[in-house]
Swiss-Prot record:
It comes from Haemophilus influenzae (strain 86-028NP). SUPFAM superfamilies: Glucocorticoid receptor-like (DNA-binding domain), N-terminal domain of MutM-like DNA repair proteins, S13-like H2TH domain. Belongs to the FPG family. Its EC number is 3.2.2.23, 4.2.99.18. DNA binds at residues 90, 109, 150. GO terms for molecular function: 8-oxo-7,8-dihydroguanine DNA N-glycosylase activity; class I DNA-(apurinic or apyrimidinic site) endonuclease activity; damaged DNA binding; zinc ion binding. Signal peptide: none annotated. This is Formamidopyrimidine-DNA glycosylase. The gene is mutM.
Length: 271
């Protein structure tokens, strides 16, 4: 699943080809995604794009009339291609702009979404989202206060978008390992020092992943078709039974919240 670094990579890749250009039309081949493609998007024509931003794992295309909200789902990707490019089986949406290019959305599992809103402040999917992990709002004191009375496994807590957005499975695993904290530790038992370490590590891991163009494990490609290279730097994620890069012991895995979790039992003691 594309996580925050992958979505940020996509945003940076597509922005130069879309910002300040005009949407000529939107071609929708498969309107039934996770949610049906918004009718306003299907009929959108001759509208200027004024900006592109990101909120959590959502791409936001700002136009003169409203906002296109895109989510890549489990296997989606976006890329910029010439308007005469051949269409692949899973190319479901084209946003055609007046520079000879188009934004093409590909999604084999069709679990993404492309929606429309005229008011971001009232957009229902954004109302309960926590702070951005790279923002000043996400800090040690915030995490400490948010974790009090939370008898939840720490990894599950960090992946809760109401706590902080965009810390997905890969980056939660990596951050906890670097900090030496067991993924099953109860959130309420975090110390202030651990919160300080976790916040700084999460920010550092995400920034490094963005620089590397995200993590390619299966479906994700950058907008230019290249893979993300952060997978080459993963310390524990996907490395079950391999030696721990810190102590040489064996990396173990377990299921937490229906997601695979990877950790070193020697370096990440539960408590």
């Amino acid at each position: 699943m594309p996580e925050l670094p992958e979505v940020e990579t996509a945003l940076r890749g597509i922005s130069p080809y879309l910002k300040n250009f005009t949407i000529e039309k939107v071609v929708v081949r498969k309107p039934k995604l996770r949610w049906a493609v918004s009718e306003e998007l299907i009929t959108l024509k001759n509208v200027k794009i004024v900006d592109l931003t990101r909120r959590a794992k959502y791409l936001i295309i700002h136009t003169e009339k409203g906002y296109i909200i895109g989510h890549l789902g489990m296997s989606g990707s976006v890329r910029i291609v010439p308007q005469d490019s051949a269409i692949d089986k899973h190319d479901h949406i084209d946003i055609v702009v007046n520079n000879g290019k188009l934004l093409r959305y590909n999604d084999p599992r069709r679990f993404g979404a492309w929606l429309w809103t005229e008011n971001l402040d009232d957009f229902h999917l954004f109302l309960k989202l926590g702070p951005e992990p790279l923002s000043d709002e996400f800090n040690a004191e915030y995490l400490f206060k948010k974790s009090r009375q939370k008898s939840t496994a720490l990894k599950t807590f960090l992946m809760d978008n109401a706590v902080v957005v965009g810390v997905g499975n890969i980056y939660a695993n990596e951050s906890l390992f670097i900090c030496g904290i067991h993924p099953l530790k109860l959130a309420k038992n975090l110390t202030r020092n651990q919160c300080f370490s976790l916040v700084n590590t999460i920010k550092d891991v995400l920034r490094k992943a963005i620089i590397q163009g995200g993590t390619t494990l299966k479906d994700f490609l950058q907008p230019d078709g290249r893979p993300g290279y952060f997978a080459q730097e993963l310390l524990v994620y996907g490395n079950k039974d391999k030696p721990c890069p810190k102590c040489g012991g064996k990396i173990e895995s377990l299921i937490i919240g229906q997601r695979n979790s990877f950790f070193c039992p020697k370096c990440q003691k539960r408590g």
